[in-house]
């Protein structure tokens, strides 16, 4: 179901006059959980940009650049190579791509750290107040109200601490 919403989002971009749309296929994510061997996205997530390209003729209209390259998030060097290759039309240099990839992965580490720190705060609160909490597991697209149907707000109405699965996966 979430993938179906992409059609509307792409149409919205086109209606706003956006002429370059970058929607990469991502088969492999970073393997950030030690001792696991599966960091492969589901086929829908990994390949839906191809489906969109095949099913939305407006993406093939003159003047529209629809970019759907394959990226392997687990291989930083390959990411640099692919960025240079895919953005050659914009004259992106290898140095620029390396800087961008390094900054993106560094910021992702900051984000993961921040999420874990918030989780630790919630756990400390639960211990201090002798209360239970909820670990809310999901995918990034679950923040869309069309998809989550207000479940996060309903959970919040119980006044329990909510912890992201990303905050505690390492425990």
What does each of the following model-derived ranges do?
Residues 1-171:
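An N-terminal assembly and electron-transfer interface module characteristic of large anaerobic redox
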């Amino acid at each position: 179901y979430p993938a179906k919403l992409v059609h509307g989002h792409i149409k919205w971009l086109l209606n706003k006059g956006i002429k370059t749309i970058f929607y990469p296929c991502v088969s492999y994510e970073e393997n950030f959980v030690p001792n696991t061997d599966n960091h492969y996205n589901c086929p829908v997530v990994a390949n839906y940009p191809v489906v969109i390209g095949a099913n939305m003729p407006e993406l093939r209209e003159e003047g529209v650049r629809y970019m759907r390259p394959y990226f392997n998030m687990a291989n930083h060097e390959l990411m640099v190579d692919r960025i240079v290759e895919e953005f050659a039309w914009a004259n992106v240099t290898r140095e620029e791509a390396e800087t961008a990839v390094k900054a993106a992965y560094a910021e992702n580490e900051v984000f993961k750290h921040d999420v874990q720190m918030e989780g630790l705060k919630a756990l400390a609160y639960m211990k201090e107040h002798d209360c239970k909490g909820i670990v809310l597991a999901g995918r990034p697209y679950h923040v869309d109200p069309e998809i989550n149907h207000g479940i996060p707000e309903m959970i919040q109405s119980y006044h329990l601490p909510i912890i992201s699965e990303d905050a505690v996966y390492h425990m």
